[in-house]
Amino acid sequence: MKTTCLLISLILIQGVKTLPILEIASNIQPQNVDSVCSGTLQKTEDVHLMGFTLSGQKVADSPLEASKRWAFRAGVPPKNVEYTEGEEAKTCYNISVTDPSGKSLLLDPPTNIRDYPKCKTIHHIQGQNPHAQGIALHLWGAFFLYDRIASTTMYRGKVFTEGNIAAMIVNKTVHKMIFSRQGQGYRHMNLTSTNKYWTSSNGTQTNDTGCFGTLQEYNSTKNQTCAPSKKPLPLPTAHPEVKLTSTSTDATKLNTTDPNSDDEDLTTSGSGSGEQEPYTTSDAATKQGLSSTMPPTPSPQPSTPQQGGNNTNHSQGVVTEPGKTNTTAQPSMPPHNTTTISTNNTSKHNLSTPSVPIQNATNYNTQSTAPENEQTSAPSKTTLLPTENPTTAKSTNSTKSPTTTVPNTTNKYSTSPSPTPNSTAQHLVYFRRKRNILWREGDMFPFLDGLINAPIDFDPVPNTKTIFDESSSSGASAEEDQHASPNISLTLSYFPKVNENTAHSGENENDCDAELRIWSVQEDDLAAGLSWIPFFGPGIEGLYTAGLIKNQNNLVCRLRRLANQTAKSLELLLRVTTEERTFSLINRHAIDFLLARWGGTCKVLGPDCCIGIEDLSRNISEQIDQIKKDEQKEGTGWGLGGKWWTSDWGVLTNLGILLLLSIAVLIALSCICRIFTKYIG
């Protein structure tokens, strides 16, 4: 009887501690699974901001039921790229992240911002984008969007150009899972409501039967079990409690989480849904019509765990992949005698892997060498190099195999970073200017730490010119630059190409004649007088006419040059003001976050906070386009077009006809007078 009561009590306590989120089907024995499904958030450092930039063009075919999802807003200079937006979540969940005392760690959305999203959603970016090639943001998290007008509404038939500067708040453990290839297998989710997920179609990867890639419909009636991973990896246990409440009419609550299930690389009570995948290129390879929409800036991407002779050797890290862009606030980890991976790559950015200490990991001295050809290697045995973009795969093949030394770690993992006197270890801190802010009563939420500290890097894409270039400090070493904070890239398309073969186009200074002849009054009178001299006058008049034509062409050329320079100046000014407007909105959001517990910005400032930043970029763009159209219109020839009686020659012909008629009338009158004189006389 006592044993039964004890078991019932333990079951009740376990039911209180674990949070029902989802059900995971696994073939792995319970003793091989590290129980990471429970836990509470101890400090806000465990919640990190992951920012990224979306760009491109999309046409909204139908209005969305909810406006809390990604959108693209017109009115700013569009990028000249093709873009395909991925999954648009049909069900939106409210989310709450609380500390152990039950206090919410997510601030309420500002009241003066329309359609401010705070929901669980599913998004995927196809093509050559930061999260391209099958990596889906399918984790439970709070999504906070900052676009150019603080609005995420999409309207019917509207072409949305330009992207959003987005931020997603996730748990640190989940954040680490997104950019680390920890498990080769995947888990099966049983959701009570109809959902969409991504399945990979790449057959070259082993154990690649999983749940990302091509968009497919999924509901609880389907019974697809993904291949589990061979060995779970131990993870930190500091995770936020997540409570999901569906706001959609067809959404219901989620099933109970089994703490003994296969969840080695997921913190379901944190903010993740659990799916992880190896880096594949199947989705991007099948999208032939897509082109790159992002500048080539370093981006954390998944990496493969080392699996040597025994299953206890694991390394966990973040690989910065060239050709990808992702503004991510990476957690600061205390490195211990770690080394980095350095490869000779033809891409702009070298691959680097800051190693992260792992819980319950001891005596890691195994070295793993990545093969030169990723497709012919076994991913479960070696550390794979990230696959490049399909458009740059030929020029970015690795020429040297990197060697990774797995660090020695202790059997415990601390969630708070500790300063290390070792200079090499300091280089492995992902954010050099990462503020070490722990949760204390009365402290502000450092959610915007990564976005505020991230440098702005305008890295141009093809057919693009930039006017700003704020790179990292000159004193930073090359190794430190590899681990620099990710950049927020804001690159706008610049002045379009104009036909340079057009005569007197005014595109550059050499098109127009340097000498502009101004004829004086005396010269005009002299030319007019000399033109009446027989034989000599027509020659003088011809030279005079040739000079006038040359001057006219030169004036037209200079006017075109002035129009081109004016249009370029207006575009540069529009670009600067657009970026300033964007950064002003971001700063306003940050101020709203900081002043939220005192009632918001408007409560502190009063009526002075109601300042609207009007977006007149579309009007300016239309004026620039009109200037370009006007200056590109050419009127060549002698005006022979149109109706003959309204052209220049038509007027002369009419005058000639009138003159001939007058002469004929005079001759006729003269003849009539002679006839009358003859008969009368």
From Swiss-Prot:
Q: How is it modified after translation?
A: N-glycosylated. O-glycosylated in the mucin-like region.
Subunit structure as annotated in this protein's UniProt entry: Homotrimer; each monomer consists of a GP1 and a GP2 subunit linked by disulfide bonds. The resulting peplomers (GP1,2) protrude from the virus surface as spikes. GP1,2 interacts with human CD209 and CLEC4M (collectively referred to as DC-SIGN(R)). Asialoglycoprotein receptor (ASGP-R) may be a liver-specific receptor for GP1,2. Members of the Tyro3 receptor tyrosine kinase family may be cell entry factors interacting with GP1,2.
* Any GO BP: virion attachment to host cell
Q: Which Pfam families match?
A: Ebola-like_HR1-HR2 (PF22307), Filo_glycop (PF01611)
Q: What does this protein do?
A: GP1 is responsible for binding to the receptor(s) on target cells. Interacts with CD209/DC-SIGN and CLEC4M/DC-SIGNR which act as cofactors for virus entry into the host cell. Binding to CD209 and CLEC4M, which are respectively found on dendritic cells (DCs), and on endothelial cells of liver sinusoids and lymph node sinuses, facilitate infection of macrophages and endothelial cells. These interactions not only facilitate virus cell entry, but also allow capture of viral particles by DCs and subsequent transmission to susceptible cells without DCs infection (trans infection). GP2 acts as a class I viral fusion protein. Under the current model, the protein has at least 3 conformational states: pre-fusion native state, pre-hairpin intermediate state, and post-fusion hairpin state. During viral and target cell membrane fusion, the coiled coil regions (heptad repeats) assume a trimer-of-hairpins structure, positioning the fusion peptide in close proximity to the C-terminal region of the ectodomain. The formation of this structure appears to drive apposition and subsequent fusion of viral and target cell membranes.
Q: Which PANTHER family match?
A: VIRAL ENVELOPE PROTEIN
Keywords of the record, alphabetical order, are: Cleavage on pair of basic residues, Disulfide bond, Fusion of virus membrane with host endosomal membrane, Fusion of virus membrane with host membrane, Glycoprotein, Host cell membrane, Host membrane, Host-virus interaction, Lipoprotein, Membrane, Palmitate, Signal, Transmembrane, Transmembrane helix, Viral attachment to host cell, Viral envelope protein, Viral penetration into host cytoplasm, Virion, Virus entry into host cell
- Extract the signal peptide range: 1-18
Q: Which SUPFAM superfamilies match?
A: Virus ectodomain (SSF58069)
- What are the boundaries of the region Receptor-binding? 38-188
Entry-listed glycosylation sites: 94, 171, 190, 202, 207, 219, 223, 255, 310, 313, 326, 337, 344-345, 350, 360, 397, 408, 422, 487, 564, 619
Question: At the top level of its lineage, which domain of life is listed?
Answer: Viruses
Residues covalently joined to lipid (S-palmitoyl cysteine): 671, 673
Where is the site labelled Cleavage?
435-436
Q: What is this protein called?
A: Envelope glycoprotein
- What does the organism's lineage look like at the top? Viruses, Riboviria, Orthornavirae, Negarnaviricota, Haploviricotina
Q: Which InterPro entries match?
A: Ebola-like_HR1-HR2, GPC_FiloV, GPC_filovir-type_extra_dom, TLV/ENV_coat_polyprotein
Query: Region labeled Disordered — which residues?
Result: 222-424
> Which segments does the topology annotation call Extracellular?
19-648
Question: What parts of the sequence cross the membrane?
Answer: 649-669
